Amino acid sequence: MMHFDPTVNAPSGRVHSIQSLGTVDGPGIRHVTFLQGCPLRCACCHNPDTWDTEGGTLYTPEALFAEASRCREYFGKAGGVTLSGGEPLLQAHFAAAYFSLCRDAGLHTCLDTSGCFLNEDAKALLSLTDRVLLDVKYPNEDDYRKHVGGSLQDTLAFLTHLNAQGIPTTLRTVIIPGLTDTAEHEAFLARLVGEHACIDKVECLPFKKLCTVKYEKMGIPFPLADTPTPDITSVKEMQSRISEFIR
C-alpha cells in the first residue's frame, strides 16, 4: 500500500491569526494558529471574525511550519503546535500537510475542533494529530440546531472515531448560565466521559463577553449580550464532578 503524503499538492491555507506562545489551547506552551472559516454560528462564539471562508491571510504549510519552528525552544517537553479556528476541519488537507511537517520535526500536534464533520481529509488530519480538544456544546439535538446551527450527531460520530483510533481527547464545553449550566448537560458530559476511554481530560470554560466589541464592529447582534457570565467557582466544581468519570 502506498503511503499517503498530505504535503503533496497541498493547498495554501487561510489563517485568521497566530498566537506564538499560547498556554490555554493544549498542553504546555504552544504555537497556536487560528484558521479562517467556520460553518457553524454558535451563539457564544467569541471569534465571529473567523466565520468568513474567504478572509484571512494565505499561508503554505511550509511557511506556517517555518513560523512555528521559530518558537520551538519555548515548547519544552509538554508544548507544541495547535490548530484552532474558526473550524480547522474546513481546511483539513492544508492542516494535515502542516501537521505532517510538524510531526516529522518531532513537534506535538493538537487540534481544537467542534467535530462537525468527518470526511477522508479529516480522517487523514486526525491520523497526524496527537491530541484533540473537542468542543461539545449542548446535550441535545434541539439546542444544537438552535444555538449552533449544527448537529450533535455529527460531533458524536466524530468522538466515536476518536475513541476507535485511541486519540487522546480533551472534552471541552462552555458553561453558559441558563443554557449549559444545567443538570442535563452535566449528566450528558459525564456519560460521554465514562463511555469513551479516549477522553482523559475535561475542561469547563466560563462563558465570557469580551467578544461584544467584535460583534459591534461587524454590525451584527451578539445573541447572548444579555446573558450573565457564570460564577467561576461553580464552573470549576462542575468540571471536577465530570472529571470523576474519566476512565
Where are these predicted regions, by residue range?
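Short, conserved loop/turn and helix-capping segments at secondary-structure boundaries
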Residues: 58, 149-152, 229-232
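Conserved alpha-helical substructure of the radical SAM core
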Residues: 48-81
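Solvent-exposed alpha-helices and their adjacent loops that cap or buttress functional pockets
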Residues: 8, 24-26, 75, 125
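Conserved AdoMet/S-adenosylmethionine-binding subsite of the radical SAM
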Residues: 69-73, 77-80, 85, 89-210, ...
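Auxiliary Fe-S-binding modules of radical SAM enzymes
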Residues: 1-22, 177-247
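Short glycine-enriched, charge-decorated loop/helix-capping segments at active-site entrances
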Residues: 49-53, 145-151, 218-227
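Canonical Radical SAM [4Fe-4S] cluster-binding loop centered on the CxxxCxxC motif
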Residues: 11, 17-19, 23-59
